[in-house]
Every structure is written in structure tokens, then in C-alpha cells.
């Protein structure tokens, strides 16, 4: 029996897809937590969880001033496999 994906997992799937399609380019900042929460109809905790996972995968970097998209070349093959699921 499968369970429905969590809100954070849904956000991860959408953001990684948008990054791979070039909607967010390397070096570009993602929208603020507040803006993402409004867009996805979720709380900021789910946004933080999604961003943390994307950072662990090497897709984005969190720094003062916001979350920036990393170049795809920096991602490992394992990450690329995850992205293409």
C-alpha cells in the first residue's frame, strides 16, 4: 500500500523539475520562503524541508540573501538519477 507524498516531497518534485527545465538558472535565486509557501499553499516548514533536501542533493545552495540554484555539473550521477525519477 503506497502513501501519498508529503507536501515537502511535492514541492521538491515541482522545484527540481523547474530547475531541470531551466525555469531557474544556475546562480539565480529562488523565490522567498514566504512566496513559495503562498504559491504552494503550504506552511514555511514544508518549504524549509524541501529546500533542505534540495541542498543535500546539491541542487541549490543556501546562503545569506537567499537560496541559489547550483550548476547541474556539480550534481553527482546519483543526484541526476533522483532528479529524473
Task: Go through each PLM region and give its residues.
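Short linear motifs at protein or domain termini
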Residues: 1-85
